[in-house]
Amino acid sequence: YCWFIIACNLWSISILICPMNNLSQKKILLTICGGISAYKSLELIRLLKKQDAEVKTILTKNAKEFVTPLSVASLSQGKVYDDLFNAENEAEMDHISLSRWADVILVVPATANTISKLSAGSSDDLASTVILASDKDVFLMPAMNVRMWEHPSTKQNLNKLKSYGYEIVGPEIGDMA
């Protein structure tokens, strides 16, 4: 089954579409984590929207240190989700509705912290809870310092996530910022 391949590496963003497939009407949940390369997620949103994909976004607490909810909302043309507990509508469980809505989940940049949390099955924020509650394809685009990338814990966590069926895309070598 040929979905589509998204190559959003640490230092370059491009979308490669399978020859017989396109992103029109695809529901993509973009989870933006707190790393210096988070700003590149803005370009990814723009590219996905240009391909007529439906994009919803989750910002982790740390992601908001690098990109603003306003810029993400402007590009995605929708609400930015950032809290596990929805004060506006307590009856709505965003982690369930978002996990059901998405055709695919992208984690950009997938930080060492996020990779560790997902590997451990932690669900202490909206992003990790949505992913844990989902049965959809999950693509992780790791972005971190080379020493963090090469650390045995990171390698072990990535191997565990691969065994769960998560797709790891990248990283490449280059500048993060």
Protein language model regions, located:
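A cross-family phosphate/adenosyl-ligand binding-site feature
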Residues: 15-139, 145-177
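Feature targets compositionally biased, intrinsically disordered low-complexity regions
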Residues: 1-2, 17
